C-alpha cells in the first residue's frame, strides 16, 4: 500500500490530544496534524462535537432557500415548491445523519429545524390552499436510525458483529423482547450518545 502524505492527515482524538505524541511521519515525511477534517462530506473535529458540521449544513441549506424564494415569486405551485424542498434542501440537512443524529445538542437541533420552518413559511405564504406540513426532521432522523439498526440485527449484515452478543434466551424468556442485547456501560455522555449505545437503549 502506497500512502500519499500530501493527502494524508493526522487527527488526535480524546485524552491523547492533551498530551500529543511526536508527529507522525511516513517515509521520512511528516504528516500534517489537523484539528478538523472533512471525510465523505462530514466535518469531523478533534473534540468529536458537531458545531462545525451543523454550521456547514445550515449554511448550505440556507443558500438553497434563495432559489425556493425565486420559485415562489415565479408563481410555482405550493406542491411543486414542497417537492423542491424535499429533493434539494432537506437532503442537505439529513446527509449522513446517522453519524451525528444522537450526538447533536438541542441548540444544534433548533438551528437545523429553523431551516425547515423558514422553508415551510415560504411555501405556505400567500397560499389560498391549506397549509402544507411535513414530518419533523428529528422524527425522520430517528426513523432512519431505527431502520438502519434493525438492518444491523441481521446476521448477514456486515456490521452485525459490531453489536454486543444476544443475552441468554433462558434468562430473558419472560421479557417482551427475549433477544435483548446488553447496553454497553457508558462512562461518558459522549459515548452514551453514540449511535450504537443510543440505538441499543431505544431498542430494549
Regions found by a protein language model. Give the residues of each.
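Basic, alpha-helical interaction scaffolds
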Residues: 29-99
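Short, conserved catalytic/metal-binding micro-motifs enriched in Asp/Glu and His
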Residues: 39-47, 61, 89, 93-101, ...
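Hydrophobic alpha-helix feature that most strongly marks membrane-spanning transmembrane helices
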Residues: 44, 66, 70-73, 89, ...
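C-terminal accessory extensions/subdomains outside the catalytic/core fold
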Residues: 160-161, 167-186, 190
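Short, charged alpha-helical motifs in flexible N/C-terminal segments and linkers
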Residues: 1-5, 9-12, 108-171, 195
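Short, conserved micro-motifs composed of acidic
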Residues: 2-35
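Alpha-helical interaction elements in eukaryotic regulators
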Residues: 50, 57, 64, 85, ...
Amino acid at each position: 500500500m502506497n500512502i500519499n502524505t500530501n493527502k494524508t492527515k493526522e487527527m488526535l482524538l480524546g485524552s491523547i490530544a492533551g498530551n500529543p505524541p511526536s508527529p507522525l511521519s511516513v517515509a521520512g515525511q511528516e504528516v500534517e496534524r489537523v484539528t478538523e477534517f472533512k471525510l465523505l462530506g462530514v466535518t469531523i473535529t478533534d473534540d468529536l462535537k458537531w458545531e462545525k458540521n451543523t454550521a456547514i449544513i445550515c449554511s448550505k441549506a440556507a443558500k438553497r432557500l434563495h432559489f425556493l424564494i425565486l420559485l415562489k415569486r415565479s408563481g410555482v405551485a405550493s406542491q411543486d415548491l414542497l417537492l423542491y424542498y424535499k429533493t434539494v434542501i432537506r437532503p442537505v440537512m439529513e446527509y449522513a445523519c446517522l453519524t451525528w443524529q444522537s450526538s447533536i445538542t438541542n441548540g444544534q437541533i433548533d438551528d437545523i429545524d429553523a431551516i425547515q420552518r423558514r422553508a415551510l413559511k415560504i411555501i405556505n405564504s400567500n397560499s389560498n390552499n391549506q397549509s402544507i406540513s411535513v414530518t419533523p426532521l428529528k422524527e425522520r432522523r430517528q426513523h432512519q436510525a431505527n431502520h438502519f439498526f434493525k438492518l444491523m440485527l441481521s446476521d448477514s449484515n456486515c456490521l452485525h458483529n459490531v453489536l454486543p452478543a444476544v443475552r441468554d434466551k433462558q434468562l430473558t424468556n419472560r421479557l417482551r423482547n427475549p433477544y435483548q442485547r446488553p447496553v454497553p456501560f457508558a462512562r461518558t455522555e459522549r459515548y452514551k450518545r453514540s449511535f450504537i449505545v443510543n440505538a441499543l437503549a431505544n431498542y430494549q
